[in-house]
Amino acid sequence: MVGLSHYLILGSLLFAISVIGIFLNRKNVIILLMAIELMLLAVNLNFIAFSHYLNDVAGQVFVFFILTVAAAESAIGLAILVVLFRNLRTINVDDLDSLKG
């Protein structure tokens, strides 16, 4: 049977993979957004595991709200990224440091 510790180990591995992805690839904005979303999903997995272990539905409902906010965040982030790519022709983080006024 799959216990709580298995879910927590999986969540911590996903979180560690996303942190490593952020530190190893600081150039591409799309990969940074994907790593941040993976980090959020790892935390949600831990919420679900604890909620199931404690027989409490409130944690699972909270995860649905978090996923809704994460979807909106991803949509806004990708929309901003599309506008930046249209204006600057790059998605490199180093090239996005200048401001136009």
Curated annotation (Swiss-Prot):
It catalyses: a quinone + NADH + 5 H(+)(in) = a quinol + NAD(+) + 4 H(+)(out). The chain crosses the membrane at residues 4-24, 30-50, 61-81. One of its GO terms (molecular function) is quinone binding. Its EC number is 7.1.1.-. It is a multi-pass membrane protein. Pfam families: Oxidored_q2 (PF00420). GO terms for biological process: ATP synthesis coupled electron transport. It is found in: Cell inner membrane. One of its GO terms (cellular component) is NADH dehydrogenase complex. Keywords: Cell inner membrane, Cell membrane, Membrane, NAD, Quinone, Translocase, Transmembrane, Transmembrane helix, Transport, Ubiquinone. It is an enzyme of class 7 (translocase). The keyword Repeat does not apply. The keyword Membrane applies. It comes from the Bacteria. Its main location: membrane. PANTHER family: NADH DEHYDROGENASE SUBUNIT 4L-RELATED, NADH-UBIQUINONE OXIDOREDUCTASE SUBUNIT ND4L. NCBIfam families: PRK05715.1-2, PRK05715.1-3, PRK05715.1-5. NDH-1 is composed of 14 different subunits. Subunits NuoA, H, J, K, L, M, N constitute the membrane sector of the complex. Belongs to the complex I subunit 4L family. NDH-1 shuttles electrons from NADH, via FMN and iron-sulfur (Fe-S) centers, to quinones in the respiratory chain. The immediate electron acceptor for the enzyme in this species is believed to be ubiquinone. Couples the redox reaction to proton translocation (for every two electrons transferred, four hydrogen ions are translocated across the cytoplasmic membrane), and thus conserves the redox energy in a proton gradient. This is NADH-quinone oxidoreductase subunit K. It comes from Methylotenera mobilis (strain JLW8 / ATCC BAA-1282 / DSM 17540).
